[in-house]
């Protein structure tokens, strides 16, 4: 992290490879998620929704095969910029809005397992 920038995340995020179904504003897509925390998820997409957009998410956690359905809010977006040299990780950061406690516990369990590896 460069000097002057501070990490805003309050909890640990871990790398994952998940398929995520999401829908918002009449758009229905099936994308990949590359990291997750107890508070949110990063979804790779070349055409992310704008910050503030509410999104219905559905994904299955590895190992537990637990299916999670949750409302999320886009907190930041990094759209694909094909003509730019440095355009890493196009996608959007999504904060979970109404995550059930049981689902949060399942995600935390996954995070602990991955963090130990």
Predicted features and spans:
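C-terminal output/interaction extensions
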Residues: 83-117
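A generic structural micro-feature
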Residues: 12, 48-51, 64-66, 85-89
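Short coil-to-beta-strand transition motifs
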Residues: 15, 61-71
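Conserved hydrophobic positions within beta-strands
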Residues: 33, 72-74
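N-terminal helix initiation/capping motif
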Residues: 1-38, 108-117
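Short strand-loop-strand
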Residues: 19-51, 56, 91-93
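Hydrophobic beta-strand positions in extracellular immunoglobulin-like domains
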Residues: 59-61, 74, 96
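Short, conserved beta-turn/loop elements at beta-strand boundaries and strand-helix junctions
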Residues: 77-82
């Amino acid at each position: 992290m460069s000097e002057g920038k501070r990490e805003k995340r309050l909890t640990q995020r871990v790398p994952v490879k998940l398929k995520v179904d999401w829908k918002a504003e009449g758009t229905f897509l099936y994308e990949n998620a590359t990291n997750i925390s107890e508070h949110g998820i990063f979804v790779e997409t070349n055409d992310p929704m704008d910050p503030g957009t509410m999104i219905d998410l559905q994904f299955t956690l590895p190992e537990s095969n637990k299916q999670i359905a949750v409302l999320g809010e886009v907190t930041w977006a990094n759209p694909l910029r094909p003509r730019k040299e440095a355009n890493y990780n196009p996608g959007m950061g999504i904060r979970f809005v109404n995550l059930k406690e049981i689902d949060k516990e399942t995600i935390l369990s996954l995070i602990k397992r991955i963090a130990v590896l």
